[in-house]
């Protein structure tokens, strides 16, 4: 049996193509229902996310070409695109390369945002669906569980998921460094920019107590306040609101400063000098830089956040090198296990034959064994079983070892001939 993987990802295909393979579309059968009917395919996994669509199957090695063509035809039909158009988007991997790719995917090394945790859950969900459809067996079960173990090892032994790699998450990271805990804090959004909205969403997930939204257009402020279950205010109210907020995210890009040093200083006096975290992601800047010189005020602009993001991204790239080494080691372990499958039937038959001889000889001794006590009879049986295990140990260990060196089939054939094993 061989392993074959066919797929496309954000690296090889546009979203307009990938979304055609979504599992969420109504009135569509699951691809596994079709794949399981294809000749020569024994096991299958179908993974469909926003950023990738992949089919992993185990099939007879001699039928690999036909299986590949069949899967591509099925994907073209499902996506409603020509085979030629689909071919430009696809990659095809087999054997150890397919296993390596799956390990990298599960470990988030192949993700759009390297280190993100969602992909592992998506792979587990795809595996659950494959199990429910009855299209998994010894090979895919082993590979998938191994992939989960590899992903866990990568996450615990490297810093691949450490630190923020988006401006929104960078804002959360900085806020945590300043305040420690964010639950109970209050946010003021000034302006309705996309980045400020994303930053606010990330902060709200940390248990933020409430949010104020100020905008030049009050209708837009009301709209955003409704999204965040907050309160809309006009820009003129910002100096007054400053006294009661902990975090300000500003993104108006106005020609003049929306928050001046004097406004911030006045607010600090009324706040009894509680910390104030100002995030200015506007271009041109919304907050007068001198405001950052005030005690207990922490001012960061878009360049500061981007520097942090770049530093964190470089850190993840360094950690990715460690992760790749782990994956190479685990691919080697999988290959070693896979090579033993060729000799397993011989080992099983060898054990059955030797145990059969033992049972036959014990049967011949039934007449005199009856004169023994029950305890002594058990001792005899235990002794015979121990002798069998010792006889079996060296040959089977040698056979497994040689299978890892790709000599397994030759040694298995020799063992079968020596002991006249049937199959």
UniProtKB/Swiss-Prot annotation:
Pathway info: Porphyrin-containing compound metabolism; protoporphyrin-IX biosynthesis; 5-aminolevulinate from L-glutamyl-tRNA(Glu): step 1/2
Pfam families in the cross-refs: GlutR_dimer (PF00745), GlutR_N (PF05201), Shikimate_DH (PF01488)
Role noted for this protein: Catalyzes the NADPH-dependent reduction of glutamyl-tRNA(Glu) to glutamate 1-semialdehyde (GSA).
Residues engaged in binding NADP(+): 191-196
Catalytic activity, reaction form: (S)-4-amino-5-oxopentanoate + tRNA(Glu) + NADP(+) = L-glutamyl-tRNA(Glu) + NADPH + H(+)
UniProt subunit comment: Homodimer.
Entry-linked InterPro entries: 4pyrrol_synth_GluRdtase, 4pyrrol_synth_GluRdtase_dimer, 4pyrrol_synth_GluRdtase_N, GluRdtase_CS, GluRdtase_dimer_dom_sf, GluRdtase_N_sf, NAD(P)-bd_dom_sf, Shikm_DH/Glu-tRNA_Rdtase
Family membership noted in the UniProt record: Belongs to the glutamyl-tRNA reductase family.
Keywords, in A-Z order: NADP, Oxidoreductase, Porphyrin biosynthesis
Protein's UniProt name: Glutamyl-tRNA reductase
E.C. number: 1.2.1.70
Misc. remarks from the entry: During catalysis, the active site Cys acts as a nucleophile attacking the alpha-carbonyl group of tRNA-bound glutamate with the formation of a thioester intermediate between enzyme and glutamate, and the concomitant release of tRNA(Glu). The thioester intermediate is finally reduced by direct hydride transfer from NADPH, to form the product GSA.
Site (Important for activity) location in chain: 101
Major enzyme class: oxidoreductase
CDD domains, alphabetized: NAD_bind_Glutamyl_tRNA_reduct
Active-site residue list: 50 (nucleophile)
GO biological process, one term: protoporphyrinogen IX biosynthetic process from glutamate
Free-text comment about domains: Possesses an unusual extended V-shaped dimeric structure with each monomer consisting of three distinct domains arranged along a curved 'spinal' alpha-helix. The N-terminal catalytic domain specifically recognizes the glutamate moiety of the substrate. The second domain is the NADPH-binding domain, and the third C-terminal domain is responsible for dimerization.
Binding-site positions, substrate: 49-52, 111, 116-118, 122
Entry's Gene Ontology molecular function annotations: glutamyl-tRNA reductase activity; NADP binding
């Amino acid at each position: 049996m061989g392993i074959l993987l066919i797929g496309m990802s954000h690296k090889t295909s546009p979203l307009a193509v990938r979304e055609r393979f979504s599992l969420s579309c109504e009135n569509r059968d699951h691809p596994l229902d079709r794949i399981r009917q294809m000749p020569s395919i024994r096991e299958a996994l179908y993974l469909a996310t926003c950023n990738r669509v992949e089919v992993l199957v185990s099939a007879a090695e001699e039928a690999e070409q036909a299986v590949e063509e069949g899967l591509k035809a099925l994907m073209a039909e499902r996506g409603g695109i020509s085979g030629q158009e689909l071919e430009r988007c696809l990659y095809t991997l087999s054997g150890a390369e397919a296993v390596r790719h799956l390990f990298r995917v599960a470990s988030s090394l192949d993700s759009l945002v390297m280190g993100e945790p969602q992909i592992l859950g998506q792979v587990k969900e795809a595996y659950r669906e494959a199990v429910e459809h009855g299209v998994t067996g010894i090979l895919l079960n082993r590979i998938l569980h191994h992939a989960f173990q590899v992903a866990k090892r990568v996450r615990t032994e490297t810093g691949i998921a450490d630190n923020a790699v988006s401006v929104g998450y960078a804002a959360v990271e900085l806020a945590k460094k300043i305040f420690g805990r964010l639950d109970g804090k209050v946010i003021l959004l000034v302006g309705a920019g996309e980045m400020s909205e994303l930053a606010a969403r990330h902060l709200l997930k940390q248990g933020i107590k409430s949010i104020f939204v100020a905008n030049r257009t009050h209708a837009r402020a009301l709209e955003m306040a409704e999204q965040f279950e907050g309160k809309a205010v006009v820009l003129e109210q910002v100096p007054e609101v400053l006294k009661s907020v902990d975090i300000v995210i500003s993104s108006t890009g106005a020609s003049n400063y929306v928050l001046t040093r004097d406004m911030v200083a006045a607010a600090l006096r009324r706040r009894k000098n509680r910390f104030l975290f100002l995030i200015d992601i506007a271009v041109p800047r919304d907050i007068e830089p001198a405001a950052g010189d005030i005690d207990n005020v922490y001012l960061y602009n878009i360049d500061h956040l981007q520097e942090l993001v770049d530093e964190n991204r470089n850190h993840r790239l360094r950690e990715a090198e460690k992760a790749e080494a782990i994956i190479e080691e685990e691919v080697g372990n999988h290959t070693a296990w896979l090579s033993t499958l060729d000799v397993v039937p011989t080992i099983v038959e060898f054990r059955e034959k030797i145990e059969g001889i033992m049972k036959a000889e014990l049967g011949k001794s039934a007449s005199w064994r009856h004169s023994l006590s029950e305890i002594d009879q058990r001792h005899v049986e235990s002794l015979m079983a121990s002798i069998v295990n010792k006889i079996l140990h060296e040959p089977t260990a040698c056979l497994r070892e040689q299978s890892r060196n790709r000599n397994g089939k030759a040694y298995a054939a020799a063992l079968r001939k020596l002991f006249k094993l049937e199959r």
